[in-house]
Design a protein with these regions (language model features):
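Short alpha-helical Gxxx[C/S/T] motif in the catalytic ATP-binding
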Residues: 76, 81, 85
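Conserved micro-motifs of the catalytic ATP-binding
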Residues: 1-4
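Short conserved segment of the HATPase_c
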Residues: 52-64
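A residue-level detector for a conserved hydrophobic packing site
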Residues: 9-10
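Glycine-rich ATP-binding loops of the HATPase_c
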Residues: 93-99
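Short beta-strand/loop element within the Bergerat-fold HATPase_c
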Residues: 27-39
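Short helix-loop "hinge" at the ATP-lid/N-box region of the Bergerat-fold HATPase_c
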Residues: 20-21
């Protein structure tokens, strides 16, 4: 199992999903994947559509930063969503990042988990 602050983790995942939807063409699918390996939960949320300029990726988790993407003119937002994700992931000692794919963007995180409690003792 993973120990998380539920409301904070819900907020982080919601912010990631909102961005994935916001920057995908209407009707496109959002891919969500979760897996567990060696006590770590890995999550990936991937969209198709607008890719992020490579020079903007290191700044996406900064407060009020918005990449120079023409679609930004048509989308709402304050530039705080990924900054909030950054703070919540750091709080949970998670590794995380964003990368471009061949046809979109992938957000990933690796959340360290504790070993399950042995109730047989």
């Amino acid at each position: 199992y993973c120990v998380v602050e539920q409301s904070q983790m819900e907020r982080a995942i919601q912010n990631i999903l909102v961005n994935a939807i916001r920057y995908s063409p209407s009707g496109e699918l959002i891919r969500i994947a979760l897996s567990e390996t060696h006590g770590t939960i890995r999550g990936e949320i991937e969209n198709t559509g607008v890719r992020v300029p490579d020079d903007a990726i290191p700044h996406l988790f900064e407060a009020f930063y918005r990449a120079d993407i023409s679609r930004n003119r048509n989308t709402g937002g304050t530039g705080l969503g990924l900054y909030i994700v950054h703070k919540i992931m750091k709080m949970h000692h998670a590794k995380y990042g964003i990368s471009n794919t061949s046809n979109g963007v992938r957000f990933w995180f690796e959340l360290p988990c504790r070993q399950p409690i042995d109730n047989s003792i």
